[in-house]
């Protein structure tokens, strides 16, 4: 009798995680995983002085990050500042140790985050962002759409927010400080509104401007990195809109078939914009010709929820999503030739996939001090800090004739 082959069973999430753990020594120079008491919907590295200190004969560099809480109705919520002490070889760009030595070293790294400061917070922290021009000033957004401002310079133990701003009527996830104008803060809400605040004037509780151009939930808002008056928003109304604070009307509007959840402006090219959302693809756009994408990248298997360009590497874009994955994209590899075996692993621009999370990724952040050092939080209370191995993270280099805005 002919034997009937049984269909291959799909890999479980825990089996995928175990496989990822087994590959950590080959793929990473550093991995730290911490189970938080409560989930954090947000995470962002804080700019921290690069001054190593000696602890038990070892040089350690402390880095700090923002997280929040999403608790039950009976438990208080907090904005928290966490810290991790990293070995000097993790924070440098020196070549990695050999694989055998590194495997032993990784197995003994037990760096865990410590909560060094916390602020009482009304309702859950949906987003937390520091002001680039004054990093001790931190803004948050809560489940009612209220914006809070905190000041780390105030040392009282139980000190709360120094100001709150109310305009939105519903929850929100869009929050962004202007990188070029001090004190300008954008917030976006599920009620379809976007507000611009001047946080340097805490006595004024009204928005400087409001933008009511969307007809559904506003999923994200981001400032342009070079032009101080430009910002973008994406919404469940299937539009991406470019705004100018000098105008009362949208200056560009793109309608798409599937809603975008997130967008990001390039930190190197003033015309390059990325957006992604419910169809799982990441799209690249030229602001001068917004109606047609330059390129789309497939790699995620579910909605993409966060996008960020690297602050260090030109052409490096990172995305995360509900598929539990974080993908680094090397835009300079778009269109590169592939061997058939390589094509099985994804498109040529898919540089690295971080598969260490076992539930949807809420948010991630690039460290502005240490190239390639990342942090990420997931729905199931886990915070990971990780750095890909130096041997695989050569800085992306464009071909001499490469122009991202000529892609079709």
From Swiss-Prot:
One of its GO terms (cellular component) is cytoplasm. The record marks 272 as: Important for interaction with HAT1. One of its GO terms (biological process) is chromatin organization. It is found in: Cytoplasm; Nucleus. Keywords: Chromatin regulator, Cytoplasm, Nucleus, Repeat, WD repeat. Component of the HAT-B complex composed of at least HAT1 and HAT2. The HAT-B complex binds to histone H4 tail. This is Histone acetyltransferase type B subunit 2. It comes from Kluyveromyces lactis (strain ATCC 8585 / CBS 2359 / DSM 70799 / NBRC 1267 / NRRL Y-1140 / WM37) (Yeast). The lineage of its organism: Eukaryota, Fungi, Dikarya, Ascomycota, Saccharomycotina.
């Amino acid at each position: 009798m002919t034997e009937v082959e049984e269909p291959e069973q799909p890999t479980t999430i825990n089996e995928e995680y175990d496989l990822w753990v087994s590959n950590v020594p080959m793929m990473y120079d550093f991995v730290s995983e911490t189970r938080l008491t409560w989930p954090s919907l947000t995470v962002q590295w804080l700019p921290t002085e690069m001054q190593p200190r000696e602890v038990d004969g070892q040089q350690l560099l402390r880095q700090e990050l923002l997280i929040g809480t999403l608790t039950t109705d009976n438990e208080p919520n907090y904005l928290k500042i966490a810290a991790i002490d990293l070995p000097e070889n993790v924070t440098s760009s020196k070549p990695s140790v050999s694989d055998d030595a590194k495997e032993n070293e990784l197995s003994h790294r037990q760096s865990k985050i410590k909560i060094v400061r916390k602020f009482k917070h009304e309702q859950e922290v949906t987003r937390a962002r520091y002001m680039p021009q004054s990093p001790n000033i931190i803004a948050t957004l809560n489940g009612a759409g209220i914006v809070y401002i905190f000041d780390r310079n105030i040392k009282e133990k139980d000190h709360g927010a120094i100001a709150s701003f109310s305009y939105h009527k519903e929850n929100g996830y869009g929050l962004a400080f202007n990188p070029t104008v001090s004190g300008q803060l954008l917030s976006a809400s599920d009620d379809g509104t976007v507000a611009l605040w001047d946080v340097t004037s805490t006595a004024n509780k009204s928005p400087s401007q409001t933008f009511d151009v969307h007809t559904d939930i506003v999923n994200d808002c981001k400032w342009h990195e070079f032009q101080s008056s430009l910002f973008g928003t994406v919404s469940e109304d299937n539009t991406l809109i470019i705004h100018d604070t000098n105008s009362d009307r949208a200056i560009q509007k793109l309608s798409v078939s599937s809603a975008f959840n997130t967008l990001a402006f390039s930190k190197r090219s003033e015309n390059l914009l990325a957006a992604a959302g419910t169809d799982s693809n990441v799209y690249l756009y030229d602001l001068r010709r917004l109606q047609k994408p330059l390129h789309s990248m497939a790699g995620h298997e579910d909605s993409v929820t966060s996008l960020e360009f690297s602050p260090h590497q030109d052409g490096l874009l990172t995305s995360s999503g509900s598929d539990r994955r974080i993908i680094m994209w090397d835009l300079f590899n778009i269109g590169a030739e592939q061997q058939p075996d390589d094509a099985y692993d994804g498109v040529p621009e898919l540089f690295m996939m971080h598969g260490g999370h076992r539930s949807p990724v809420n948010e991630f952040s690039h460290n502005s001090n240490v190239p390639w050092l990342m942090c990420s939080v997931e729905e199931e209370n886990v915070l990971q800090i990780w750095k890909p191995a130096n041997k695989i993270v050569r800085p992306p280099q464009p071909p001499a004739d490469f122009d991202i805005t000529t892609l079709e």
